[in-house]
């Protein structure tokens, strides 16, 4: 059932013995936040929204103008099945607005919604899928995370090398309970590394799914005494974790990525736009200092290029048929804000379409081989977070698509991250506390 009215939601609360309601949102970096109300106060919260102090959320508001309001997106209502069945807990994803009802520039869900609306205005339907990788680590005898992976398995391994199969099953079943559609789950190439993919959906639904997926993984892992980490590169000698973003475009019921892609076609121009702005987007798709340790190895790209099938490329076109035809962007990682990341990828593609950019020839070479890559003269992705911030600040494109207030605060906070890590007495310990334990 689609819950589209306040009465639908109130009936759902009564039918499901809900006693506690979470209003969930995220800051501009993709860190999930929430405020909860008792079910008895829900009618007023639905009518008036829930006020909160925006100055206490990183990148949101100044102290002197701090009030913001959460407005729940009613169709996103869901029960949290890992919470008690007596006095259940349910959750909405929310949009953030100003007290007078005006849009708030830091409302990243709203930014993604607007990008999707612009595609629809052109007669284009965009579907997005996400492939999310993560690590599972043992906790010590005091329940604190360690960097000891739960197994020493590799790609597609099974028990006894794979110790995460039962946990992945529990995650997938929980996803189904919450209205999500898991597609594939398997052990990844790193020790203790796993991947679960979701079926494609609209851009906003997929971004919501990424946020919910991370919440589910952490909850199910914690219940089993295991620490789940979405840090892009938690182990120096193992593969990094990516959040590969798959996109397809439809016009008049036809998948524009199916078959040959002409350089000046809509699909070709979309890809050309993504490639043209990929350096500027990197600070949003890869937001941590740790993110840049992943690039250039273990199927994580380093150069701005595309190809078919080739996993050393930034963008690849998988060799599939029908509705599965798509482009895959391989640089994003799970630490990103999915609303901003997907929204900006769409904006870059749209810029390519509107400017009729032509897709350059594919690079059908193994770019993980330094000797091969060195001779091609390809543009590189930023190699550090500081370089990524600079690339974004120099981008005329980003100045036109992002609210100035949001971009300024985002860059400012990112540079603070860089400085804090550099100035830490023990950078490894700083990363453990602030990123490994939290991302």
Where are these regions (language model features)?
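Glycine-rich, acidic/polar active-site loops that bind/position phosphate-bearing ligands
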Residues: 1-439
């Amino acid at each position: 059932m689609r819950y589209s009215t306040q009465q639908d939601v109130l009936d759902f609360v009564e039918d499901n013995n809900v006693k506690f309601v979470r209003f969930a949102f995220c800051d501009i970096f993709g860190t999930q936040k929430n405020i909860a109300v008792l079910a008895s106060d829900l009618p007023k919260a639905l009518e008036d929204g829930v006020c909160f102090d925006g100055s206490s959320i990183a990148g949101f508001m100044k102290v002197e103008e701090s009030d913001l309001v959460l407005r729940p997106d009613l169709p996103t209502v869901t029960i949290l099945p890992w919470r008690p069945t007596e006095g259940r807990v349910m959750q909405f994803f929310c949009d953030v607005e100003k007290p007078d009802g005006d849009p708030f520039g830091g409302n990243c869900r709203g930014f993604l919604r607007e990008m999707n609306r612009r595609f629809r205005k052109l007669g284009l339907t965009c579907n997005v899928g996400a492939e999310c990788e993560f690590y599972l680590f043992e906790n010590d005898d005091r329940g604190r995370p360690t960097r000891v992976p739960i197994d020493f398995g590799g790609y597609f391994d099974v028990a006894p090398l794979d110790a995460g199969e039962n946990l992945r099953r529990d995650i997938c079943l929980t996803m189904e309970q919450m209205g999500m559609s898991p597609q594939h789950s398997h052990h990844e190439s790193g020790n203790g590394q796993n991947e679960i993919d979701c079926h494609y959906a609209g851009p906003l639904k997929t971004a919501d799914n990424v946020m919910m997926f991370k919440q589910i993984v952490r909850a199910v892992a914690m219940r089993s005494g295991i620490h789940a980490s979405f840090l892009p590169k938690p182990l120096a000698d193992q593969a990094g974790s990516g959040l590969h973003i798959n996109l397809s475009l439809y016009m008049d019921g036809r998948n524009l990525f199916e078959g040959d892609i002409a350089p000046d076609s809509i699909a070709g121009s979309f890809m050309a736009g993504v490639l043209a702005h990929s350096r500027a987007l990197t600070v949003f798709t890869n937001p941590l200092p740790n993110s840049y340790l992943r690039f250039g190895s273990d199927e994580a790209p380093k150069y701005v290029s595309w190809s078919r099938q080739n996993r050393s490329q930034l963008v690849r076109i998988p060799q599939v048929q029908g509705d599965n035809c798509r482009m895959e962007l391989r640089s994003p990682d799970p630490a990103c804000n999915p609303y901003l990341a997907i929204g900006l990828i769409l904006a870059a593609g749209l810029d390519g379409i509107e400017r009729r950019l032509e897709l350059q020839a594919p690079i059908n070479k193994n770019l993980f081989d330094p000797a091969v890559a060195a001779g091609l003269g390809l543009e590189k992705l930023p190699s550090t977070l500081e370089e990524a911030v600079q690339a974004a600040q120099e981008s005329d494109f980003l100045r036109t698509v992002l609210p100035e207030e949001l971009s300024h605060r985002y860059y400012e906070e990112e540079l603070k991250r860089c400085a804090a890590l550099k100035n830490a007495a023990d950078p490894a310990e700083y990363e453990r506390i602030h990123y490994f334990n939290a991302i």
